Swiss-Prot record:
<feature type="modified residue" description="Phosphoserine">
    <location>
        <position position="335"/>
    </location>
</feature>
<dbReference type="GO" id="GO:0000781">
    <property type="term" value="C:chromosome, telomeric region"/>
</dbReference>
<feature type="modified residue" description="Phosphoserine; by CDK2">
    <location>
        <position position="187"/>
    </location>
</feature>
<feature type="region of interest" description="N-domain">
    <location>
        <begin position="1"/>
        <end position="104"/>
    </location>
</feature>
<feature type="binding site">
    <location>
        <position position="47"/>
    </location>
    <ligand>
        <name>DNA</name>
    </ligand>
</feature>
<feature type="binding site">
    <location>
        <position position="231"/>
    </location>
    <ligand>
        <name>DNA</name>
    </ligand>
</feature>
<dbReference type="GO" id="GO:0043137">
    <property type="term" value="P:DNA replication, removal of RNA primer"/>
</dbReference>
<feature type="region of interest" description="Disordered">
    <location>
        <begin position="327"/>
        <end position="380"/>
    </location>
</feature>
<dbReference type="InterPro" id="IPR036279">
    <property type="entry name" value="5-3_exonuclease_C_sf"/>
</dbReference>
<feature type="modified residue" description="Phosphothreonine">
    <location>
        <position position="336"/>
    </location>
</feature>
<feature type="binding site">
    <location>
        <position position="158"/>
    </location>
    <ligand>
        <name>Mg(2+) 1</name>
    </ligand>
</feature>
<feature type="modified residue" description="Symmetric dimethylarginine; by PRMT5">
    <location>
        <position position="19"/>
    </location>
</feature>
<feature type="binding site">
    <location>
        <position position="233"/>
    </location>
    <ligand>
        <name>Mg(2+) 2</name>
    </ligand>
</feature>
<dbReference type="GO" id="GO:0006284">
    <property type="term" value="P:base-excision repair"/>
</dbReference>
<dbReference type="InterPro" id="IPR029060">
    <property type="entry name" value="PIN-like_dom_sf"/>
</dbReference>
<dbReference type="GO" id="GO:0017108">
    <property type="term" value="F:5'-flap endonuclease activity"/>
</dbReference>
<keyword id="KW-0597">Phosphoprotein</keyword>
Amino acid sequence: MGIQGLAKLIADVAPSAIRENDIKSYFGRKVAIDASMSIYQFLIAVRQGGDVLQNEEGETTSHLMGMFYRTIRMMENGIKPVYVFDGKPPQLKSGELAKRSERRAEAEKQLQQAQAAGAEQEVEKFTKRLVKVTKQHNDECKHLLSLMGIPYLDAPSEAEASCAALVKAGKVYAAATEDMDCLTFGSPVLMRHLTASEAKKLPIQEFHLSRILQELGLNQEQFVDLCILLGSDYCESIRGIGPKRAVDLIQKHKSIEEIVRRLDPSKYPVPENWLHKEAHQLFLKPEVLDPESVELKWSEPNEEELVKFMCGEKQFSEERIRSGVKRLSKSRQGSTQGRLDDFFKVTGSLSSAKRKEPEPKGSTKKKAKTGAAGKFKRGK
């Protein structure tokens, strides 16, 4: 779920924090991608006649086709992706996971009714609601990525929290996910729609946390409390407090504790055994991988092993897979050129980005840095 209504709220009250870019704008950028979110998108979108793709044994293959071709598209545009997979969900998420199970059970009933009535559109709608990323999906995608020469990481807990940690450490430029709580975990830059279907023609949305905080007049701890009031995966919110009211309350009272102290409990009853303090702590200090221990390497694809896996086991067209491998290899040759701003130490924020740093002599001959370009947030 992420944070309820956060994207719309930012668009309404801090529109300058959002920038829309074409995928070509990210040439030379390293990006940490929420793998489970991407796989879920592939299972929903990569279909034939409303059904997921399958091989002759009835095994789902939509996730593999999506991962293969979307990753190639990113590489062809000079993006260096690293996929981050979910680990064990935090205990605080158990309530949300239980609700999801209930919704799945209800969708199963509605699907059976739609099938009995022969309502094709309803069948497709409820079938998609039953989509769930499994361990097998994850394992197969990891195997595919290793054969493609694309790095992946296993997060100890929530993938988006580890993606945020990688951005904060300068290992990558941005975190790519549809879950807005990546900002709540402190990612300086969030990208949405990066792995969306090309046919949808959605521009990539880039959210800048520093500008969000600046426009709202909040610090990170206050922003976390705002997100908890909006509704997160880790605890309930106060019924009756909408996005606009939540912003006003946080701006005025600065913390959930002070808001609760001043609220009329008859109008805005606080949830029983409310775990907002625990959720607050989880967002500020999540369990994440150690960015300093991470070494990201992109290597040549293993064409024969890819053909063996994708064609021999999963029954994709050999001609298409070999063609994809050639595109991937060619893209690696083109992406070795670094971004210009990787050659300089650039500081500043969105508001100060117009100031130019003096160009050091011979700087164009220096080796490009591994990480993202300091605090400079332009996706050029």
